[in-house]
């Protein structure tokens, strides 16, 4: 199968569409929610990135598995997602988590937020980190 260029929609278009539909949260605001009951931080980075450190208490849900982990009908479903009253998604810099937030909203989740700047911004703000 060959790809005819130009693409109908590139990654910049997809990010722009997702950003128009999702809510974001600053690192400063997210830090205040870190130990709040019902708030779940979800790390959508790949396993090798996650192994290098994470936000304490976060759920690892790699972007490629998110739909399966979020769907209660799937055997891979993670109960933590359904139980959370607020979900804060993050990746390295915010791109993948933007698309992940849009995906969860499309699936019917509410109170979903993308961490602006991702883990890079979290580190810059000296947010706490834990070993995976």
Map each language-model feature to its residues.
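Rhodanese-like catalytic fold shared by cysteine-dependent sulfurtransferases
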Residues: 1-39, 47-88, 95-132
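Active-site flanking residues adjacent to catalytic metal/cofactor-binding acidic residues
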Residues: 42
């Amino acid at each position: 199968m060959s790809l005819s260029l130009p693409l109908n929609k590139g990654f910049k278009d997809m990010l722009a569409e997702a950003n128009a539909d999702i809510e974001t949260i600053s690192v400063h605001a997210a830090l205040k929610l870190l130990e709040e009951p019902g708030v779940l931080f979800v790390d959508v980075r790949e396993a090798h990135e996650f192994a290098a450190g994470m936000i304490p208490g976060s759920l690892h849900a790699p972007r490629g598995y998110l739909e399966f982990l979020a769907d209660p009908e799937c055997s891979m479903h993670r109960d933590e997602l359904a139980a959370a009253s607020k979900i804060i998604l993050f990746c390295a810099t915010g791109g993948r988590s933007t698309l992940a937030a849009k995906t969860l909203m499309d699936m019917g989740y509410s109170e979903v937020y993308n961490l602006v700047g991702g883990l890079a911004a979290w580190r810059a703000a000296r947010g706490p980190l834990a070993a995976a």
